[in-house]
């Protein structure tokens, strides 16, 4: 099993959830996050006004609102899920996000005690 963590643009969360659900991956965790990449934050993505004084501050970190989703899938499903995440979220512009694939030792469904892939 693998955990797939994706950091994506806020306006891409709905189409991402829909695409994953259609493919049979309806379960995921999503949360609002702030972050920045190598560009130290792209203010053009932010939909609220940022004061000119703040924009002029050299060396200040500008964190950008993003969404983080996490889902655990069987090893054989990783290429499909990653491909869908790329297809839905790639704009070709700075700020498209990142995808991380991490190993998962065990999964347990608390309600039933099911383990491994049965718990997914």
Positions of predicted regions on the chain:
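Positively charged, small/polar-rich N-terminal and surface patches that mediate targeting and assembly
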Residues: 1-120
């Amino acid at each position: 099993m693998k955990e797939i963590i994706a950091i994506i643009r806020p306006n891409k969360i709905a189409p991402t959830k829909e695409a994953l659900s259609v493919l049979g991956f309806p379960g995921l965790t999503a949360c609002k996050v702030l972050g920045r990449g190598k560009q130290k934050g792209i203010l053009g993505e932010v939909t609220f006004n940022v004061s000119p004084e703040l924009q002029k501050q050299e060396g200040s970190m500008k964190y950008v609102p993003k969404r983080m989703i996490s889902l655990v899938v069987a090893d054989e499903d990783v290429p499909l899920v990653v491909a869908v995440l790329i297809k839905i979220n790639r704009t070709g512009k700075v700020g498209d996000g990142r995808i991380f694939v991490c190993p998962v030792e065990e999964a347990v469904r608390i309600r039933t005690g099911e383990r491994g892939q049965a718990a997914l």
